[in-house]
């Protein structure tokens, strides 16, 4: 997998950025789009602010749900109703984004996901019931776009203005297709994603802002909900350089939860003979409680898991100890040390050469993980300065500040490096390298090749990434043909192959026949995994339509609630001798009671009525009540619509 890492330079005059500053992009936000949780930050008044959502939480679950009433929920509200609506609550879209249907990790994941994942155009798509008996299929990009929209709205509510530009982070191990799909998700959400940067590097930026002196080797250990990355960075006089990176795109807190779940499912089967897996809702209830218990075990030694009417009416009650949790996951915990060992080897450093260890991601709160890291580094304490949940968004916000043209960032400029070698296949399946690993990008390299046989009319250019000498052991990125080569003996035609990588790590490969000027090229992101511009446009329109539908639905619900609260408020006041009940003649009281009961009955059988119906029913009720109350109060004022208003009127 080709991925980019960032080197951070402190330059006196940030010339590279002056170009970008010419375009006024407004406030650029930094978004950590996580597998399980997302976080948004902004560079404001010379410092980073991590922004809390409407629930007051600084991290937002990367969840989207569709209720039977046709309402779409995003974030906390979606996660909170997971147990009651598992088939239509979508999470872990990041596990699917930019991947093909046949990807073994996709096939592995869909076994555990409670919602339906289907194949469409050789890619995984998510199928849910969006209410009213309607089924809809979404690309993972669309689900991620909904989460990004939530983060965008969170920032807009805080800033009090529109946000259109963002820096979004991805795991260092994301390949081109996954990076491009993440950018597409931004486009669908109405965001111009100015940069895609790697999570561990973003964390290092957050960490590096306060520690600009001296020469240091920093190891970033990032274990989140779904991915694991280790990066080794060096800082020398304010220059960050990424020396090596490693990890596992498929290891995180959710995998630890899964182990505990499997343990309790087996235990329950052993005790009762019943298989809980048959009941999606029971499994999801267990998942929620297991996650809670896991968090509790970071600060205490045991946690109770209690679930009322867990399965077939029976309750569930078990204790999970920290020791048992560690035992169930010990192989996974220990496996995190292999990538650490690998980055040290790749960068020719000894354990004792590491100056700082930075722990990032919620799973690094697990005491056993902290202990293993500490033991690996012979007792060295990891740094505690950064909130592990927010470090990535913090770094993204710093980079967003640079792109906003915010002077207070001290003219930081980011340079990317490409830590996997890129090349093409030549005769015998040999990997011929054009761009070596750790080359600073943007970059451009060319080399002349020729034909392998006489009168060969076509050459096939196969583009690979990886460090192995034979292409079969490396990762194929894309293939294209250069045709129309005039007949000539082998070795005579001159074919120039050019590799070019831009700042976002998107690779373009061109082949040109120097004799004829014939050219062909490939942009590696445009493989079969990439959404077409038409699909993106359709998804953007869908997203807007959803926003419009959400607004209409909210207006309808508001109108229903207004009628309902008006009717019940009147009912309460008529029944209260201290209020209207004690002031009305029995005839007037009966008139209002009858009208109110009529509306309440109508409401019960017309929950799905139109906004106009709710409004007209409220008006009908007002027309009955108004003259009676006006007569009572001796004025033409409107009737009391609630107890507070009634109290205010009494004071008048």
Swiss-Prot record:
Region span, Interdomain linker: 407-417
Record flagged with keyword Nucleotide-binding: yes
CDD domains the UniProt entry points to: ASKHA_NBD_HSP70_BiP (cd10241)
Residues making up the signal peptide according to the UniProt record: 1-16
Reactions listed under catalytic activity: ATP + H2O = ADP + phosphate + H(+)
Motif Prevents secretion from ER: where in chain: 649-652
Modes of activity regulation: The chaperone activity is regulated by ATP-induced allosteric coupling of the nucleotide-binding (NBD) and substrate-binding (SBD) domains. In the ADP-bound and nucleotide-free (apo) states, the two domains have little interaction. In contrast, in the ATP-bound state the two domains are tightly coupled, which results in drastically accelerated kinetics in both binding and release of polypeptide substrates. J domain-containing co-chaperones (DNAJB9/ERdj4 or DNAJC10/ERdj5) stimulate the ATPase activity and are required for efficient substrate recognition by HSPA5/BiP.
One of the record's GO cellular component terms: cytoplasm
Alphabetized Pfam families for the sequence: HSP70 (PF00012)
Annotated region (Substrate-binding (SBD)), positions in chain: 418-498
Gene Ontology process terms (BP): cellular response to glucose starvation; cellular response to interleukin-4; cerebellar Purkinje cell layer development; cerebellum structural organization; chaperone cofactor-dependent protein refolding; endoplasmic reticulum unfolded protein response; ER overload response; ERAD pathway
Region Nucleotide-binding (NBD): start-end pairs: 123-278
Transmembrane segment boundaries: none
Subcellular location field: Endoplasmic reticulum lumen; Melanosome; Cytoplasm; Cell surface
InterPro entries from the UniProt entry: ATPase_NBD, BIP_NBD, Heat_shock_70_CS, HSP70_C_sf, HSP70_peptide-bd_sf, Hsp_70_fam
Source domain of life: Eukaryota
Cited NCBIfam families: PRK00290.1
Assembly information from the UniProt record: Monomer and homooligomer; homooligomerization via the interdomain linker inactivates the chaperone activity and acts as a storage of HSPA5/BiP molecules. Interacts with DNAJC10. Interacts with DNAJB9/ERdj4; leading to recruit HSPA5/BiP to ERN1/IRE1. Interacts with ERN1/IRE1; interaction takes place following interaction with DNAJB9/ERdj4 and leads to inactivate ERN1/IRE1.
Protein name: Endoplasmic reticulum chaperone BiP
């Amino acid at each position: 997998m080709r991925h980019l890492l960032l080197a951070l330079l402190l330059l006196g005059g940030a010339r590279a950025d002056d170009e970008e500053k010419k375009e006024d992009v407004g406030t650029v936000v930094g978004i950590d789009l996580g597998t399980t949780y997302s976080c948004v930050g902004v560079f404001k008044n010379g410092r980073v602010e991590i922004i809390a959502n409407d629930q007051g939480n600084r991290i937002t679950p990367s969840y989207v749900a569709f209720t039977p009433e046709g309402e779409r929920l995003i974030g906390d509200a979606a996660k909170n109703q997971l147990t009651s609506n598992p088939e239509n609550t979508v999470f872990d879209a990041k596990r699917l984004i930019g991947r093909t249907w046949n990807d073994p990790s996709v096939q592995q994941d869909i076994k555990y996901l409670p919602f339906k994942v289907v194949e469409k155009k050789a890619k995984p798509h998510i199928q849910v019931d969006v209410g009213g008996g309607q089924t809809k299929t979404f690309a993972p990009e669309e689900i991620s776009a909904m989460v990004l929209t939530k983060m965008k709205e969170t920032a807009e509510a805080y800033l009090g203005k529109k946000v259109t530009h963002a820096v979004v982070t991805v795991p260092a191990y994301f390949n081109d297709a996954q990076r491009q799909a993440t950018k597409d998700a931004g486009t669908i959400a109405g965001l111009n994603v100015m940069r895609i940067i790697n999570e561990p590097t973003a964390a290092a930026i957050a960490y590096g802002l306060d520690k600009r002196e001296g020469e240091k080797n920093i190891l970033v250990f990032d274990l989140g909900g779904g991915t694991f990355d280790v990066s080794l960075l060096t800082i020398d006089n304010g220059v960050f350089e990424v020396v090596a990176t490693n990890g596992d795109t498929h290891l995180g807190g959710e995998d630890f939860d899964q182990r505990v779940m499997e343990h309790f499912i087996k235990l329950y089967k052993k005790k009762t003979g019943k298989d809980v897996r048959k009941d999606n809702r029971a499994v999801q209830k267990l998942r929620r409680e297991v996650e809670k218990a896991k968090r509790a075990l970071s600060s205490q030694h045991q946690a109770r898991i209690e679930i009322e009417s867990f399965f077939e009416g029976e309750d569930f009650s078990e204790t999970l100890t920290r020791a048992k949790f560690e035992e169930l996951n010990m192989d996974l915990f220990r496996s995190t040390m292999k990538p650490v060992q690998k980055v040290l080897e790749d960068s020719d450093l000894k354990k004792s050469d590491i100056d700082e260890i930075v722990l990032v991601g919620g799973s690094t709160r697990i005491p056993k993980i902290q202990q293993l890291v500490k033991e690996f580094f012979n007792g060295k304490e990891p740094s505690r300065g950064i909130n592990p949940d927010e470090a990535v968004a913090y770094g993204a916000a710093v980079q967003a500040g640079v792109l906003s043209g915010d002077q207070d960032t001290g003219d930081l400029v980011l340079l990317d490096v490409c830590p996997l070698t890129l090349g093409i296949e030549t005769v015998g399946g040999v990997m011929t390298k054009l761009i070596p690993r750790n080359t600073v990008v943007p970059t451009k390299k060319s080399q002349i090749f020729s034909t392998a046989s006489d009168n060969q009319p076509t050459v096939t250019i196969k583009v690979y990434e990886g460090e192995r000498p034979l292409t079969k052991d490396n990762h194929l990125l894309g293939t294209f043909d250069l045709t129309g080569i005039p007949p000539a003996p082998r070795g005579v035609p001159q074919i120039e192959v050019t590799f070019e990588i831009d700042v976002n790590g998107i690779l373009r490969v061109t082949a040109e026949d120097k004799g004829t000027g014939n050219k062909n090229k490939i942009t590696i992101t445009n493989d079969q995994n990439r959404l077409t511009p038409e699909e993106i446009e359709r998804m953007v329109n869908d997203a807007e339509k959803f926003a419009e539908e959400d607004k209409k639905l909210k207006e309808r619900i508001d109108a229903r609630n207004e009628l309902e609260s008006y009717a019940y408020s009147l009912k309460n006041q008529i029944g209260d001798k201290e209020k209207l009940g004690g002031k009305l003649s029995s005839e007037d009281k009966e008139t209002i009671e009858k009208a109110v009961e009529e509306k309440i009955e109508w409401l019960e059988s017309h929950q799905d009525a139109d906004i106009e119906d709710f409004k007209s029913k409220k008006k009908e009720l007002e027309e009955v009540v108004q003259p009676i109350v006006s007569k009572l109060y001796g004025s033409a004022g409107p009737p009391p619509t609630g107890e507070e208003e009634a109290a205010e009127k009494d004071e008048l």
